[in-house]
């Protein structure tokens, strides 16, 4: 009488064994697919690395071609009074960094120069050149950025040699016209805060990025206030569109 029960147990055991074997086959196939996928991703990574190297080669080539053009541009800019002061003040972000005292100093700013390292991926420098002025001894204020393979950025900046009585303590200037002077941060803290500093991977110097990637390529558009004018045109177009929609609604 126990035979049917034994057969049932055997059938269940066989079924469990079959399911386990099937699961092993599925797991094996999944592992194999993932391994093949990883191989393809590794291959893509190599292609991407090659592409990055090629892009850097092209960028290096054209950086060298652009250099003499930038120098010619700089010569012309120096014939235009207050060019860089006007360009900075017209920039929506950089203008916020210039105090009234900074603006007086910027009237002596002759040139701004952004120069990539010979190997463009290893860093760049930003140099502000000033004419003789009553504020500091330096002819040039330079900030350099060196990119390491581990992703860190090392920053060095000119230690400003202020003339007697002209130093802005800690890079801060006091606002005038207030019983209790308000302290506003000077643009020149950009130099004093990072005379020797390292930034971790992914951390950027926002001011340097704006100067290098936005202002430097075409400062003329800010000198001419083109950026502001474009924004005004967009606002006007938006207003015209809104008025058109209102007219259509009234007609309906």
Curated annotation (Swiss-Prot):
Comp. bias regions, Acidic residues: 226-252
Keyword set, alphabetical order: Chaperone, Coiled coil, Cytoplasm, Nucleus
Domain of life: Eukaryota
Keyword Ligase: no
Region (Disordered): 1-23, 222-252
Record's GO cellular component terms: cytoplasm; nucleus
Coiled coil: 26-67
Cellular localization per UniProt: Nucleus; Cytoplasm
Record GO biological process: double-strand break repair via homologous recombination; nucleosome assembly
Family according to the record: Belongs to the nucleosome assembly protein (NAP) family.
Domain free text: The acidic domain is probably involved in the interaction with histones.
PANTHER family, per database record: TESTIS-SPECIFIC Y-ENCODED PROTEIN
Role this protein plays: Acts as a histone H2A/H2B chaperone in nucleosome assembly.
Name of the protein described by the UniProt record: NAP1-related protein 2
Organismal lineage: Eukaryota, Viridiplantae, Streptophyta, Embryophyta, Tracheophyta
